[in-house]
Amino acid sequence: MNDVYEMVKQFKRKYPFTIAWRLKKNSMIVQKHLNPGEKIKYAFAAQKNNGVFSLFSTCVVVLTNQRLLVGYKRVIFGYYFSSITPDMYNDLQVYHGLLWGRITIDTIDEEVYLSNIAPSALVEIETNVTRFMIREKKKFLARGKKESCDKTNADL
């Protein structure tokens, strides 16, 4: 059963103005890369690019209990997959345009551009991603502080 596809279909039904194609194929890429024990929290579709008029790079973005996954199946062969863990996450920017919106996810390595999203979906996406990343990043930082304190105490 493809849980990713079902969640993306729900998103597409809720926000039909979002431009997205080949949802089943794109969902299969992300489904393939889910780790055992990973639970899907939120999923949506967008175009993985910065341009409004580039309509043929639909990707599926999935927020799990461990990370953010971005995947899309290429038309001829191959696919693209990216994983953003909370420790790699820096910031998220939202742009609300006249017809569509855009989200930029800033990581340590790169900026991920997700465009052609229904403007009404932007707040929901931002809330889900930001809330998860902040919560998990706090856990990660607390774990790092504890480990450094333990190491300092061991050195004494």
Regions found by a protein language model. Give the residues of each.
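Secretory/extracellular carbohydrate-interaction modules
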Residues: 33, 37
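Small-side-chain structural scaffolding
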Residues: 43-46, 62-64, 101
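Polybasic phosphoinositide-binding surfaces of eukaryotic membrane-targeting domains
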Residues: 56-70
